[in-house]
Swiss-Prot record:
SUPFAM superfamilies assigned to the protein according to its UniProt record, in alphabetical order: Nudix
Top-tier EC class: hydrolase
Cofactor names: Mg(2+); Mn(2+)
EC number: 3.1.3.-, 3.6.1.52
Active site positions, chain numbering: E143 (nucleophile)
GO molecular function, one term: diphosphoinositol-polyphosphate diphosphatase activity
Annotated PANTHER family: BIS(5'-NUCLEOSYL)-TETRAPHOSPHATASE [ASYMMETRICAL] (PTHR21340:SF0), DIADENOSINE 5,5-P1,P4-TETRAPHOSPHATE PYROPHOSPHOHYDROLASE MUTT (PTHR21340)
Name of the molecule in the record: mRNA-decapping protein g5R
Positions that bind Mg(2+): E134, E147, E169
Catalytic activities: diphospho-myo-inositol polyphosphate + H2O = myo-inositol polyphosphate + phosphate
Organism: African swine fever virus (isolate Pig/Kenya/KEN-50/1950) (ASFV)
Gene3D superfamilies: Nucleoside Triphosphate Pyrophosphohydrolase
Biological classification of the source: Viruses, Varidnaviria, Bamfordvirae, Nucleocytoviricota, Pokkesviricetes
Keywords: Early protein, Eukaryotic host gene expression shutoff by virus, Host endoplasmic reticulum, Host gene expression shutoff by virus, Host-virus interaction, Hydrolase, Late protein, Magnesium, Manganese, Metal-binding, Multifunctional enzyme, RNA-binding
Main location: host cell
Length: 246
């Protein structure tokens, strides 16, 4: 069993117009299933059940992209112009060995055609993988700024709150650890701009927005990742924090 850990920061504000607590969510540019397939994180077993499940969790456009058998386009969809040539060469060789050499992609296309429905691009809390020797909190702070553009001095960490969630995909366990922060007063305005112009944000994210609890519940009902068990307790913590603060 492989363990993959990501660290995130739930950052909240009190919307001064609606008088509701909101948090920042980001929508990824590609599905986890698509990324796992392109990076060859799968096993080829006799019935291919895990692969078909991966294809089920991809968007229709991602499945169509794989059916072109053009690995350069698949790789570019994730990495855009990031120069990772050594990793690209390694993954391309594995893709070619698995799918192109045996039958020029016929088996792969047949498996994709067995997929039913379509996955969605996840809305999630800004998070990422820690670097070597990086603490959990330092990782959460760095990833949050990379994905939102909001600097460390613009919010306050609430150290008493820390939550985690785990789920399994095939032989991989995904563990997410979350810290909590509240925005400074000057950034609570409803129309505070969230920009996608920063290079890292363009590469990883398609949308970024403030969401209240009603929106979080709606999003969670329409995607595989349920955010409510994490964001619900965070909002309750913020309510108590603001009550005692004032």
């Amino acid at each position: 069993m492989q363990l993959k850990t990501s660290i995130g920061l739930i950052t909240c504000r009190m919307n001064t117009q609606s008088n509701q607590i909101e948090t920042i969510l980001v929508q990824k540019r590609y599905s986890l299933a698509f990324s796992e397939f392109i990076h060859c994180h799968y096993s080829i077993n006799s019935n291919h059940s895990h692969l078909i499940k991966m294809f089920n969790n991809m968007t229709i456009n991602e499945r169509l992209l794989i059916k072109t058998l053009d690995f350069d386009r698949m790789w570019y969809h994730i990495w855009i112009e990031t120069p990772v040539y050594e990793l690209y060469h390694k993954k391309y060789q594995k893709f070619k060995k698995n799918w192109l050499i045996p039958d020029n992609g016929k088996k792969l296309i047949s498996l994709i055609n067995q997929a039913k429905g379509s996955g969605t691009l996840l809305w999630e809390i800004p998070k990422g993988k820690p670097k070597e020797n990086e603490s959990d909190l330092a990782c959460a702070i760095r990833e949050f700024e990379e994905e939102t553009g909001i600097a460390r001095e613009d919010y306050q960490i609430l150290p008493a709150f820390k939550k985690s969630m785990s789920y399994f995909e095939g032989k991989t366990e995904y563990k997410h650890i979350y810290f909590l922060a509240v925005l400074c007063k000057s950034l609570e305005e409803p129309n505070m701009n969230l920009s996608l112009q920063y290079e890292t944000r363009i590469a990883e994210i398609s949308k970024i927005s403030w969401q209240n609890m009603e929106a979080v519940r709606f999003i969670s009902k329409h995607q595989s990742l349920n955010l409510e068990p994490i964001i619900g307790p965070a909002f309750n913590f913020i309510k108590n924090y603001l009550r005692y603060k004032h």
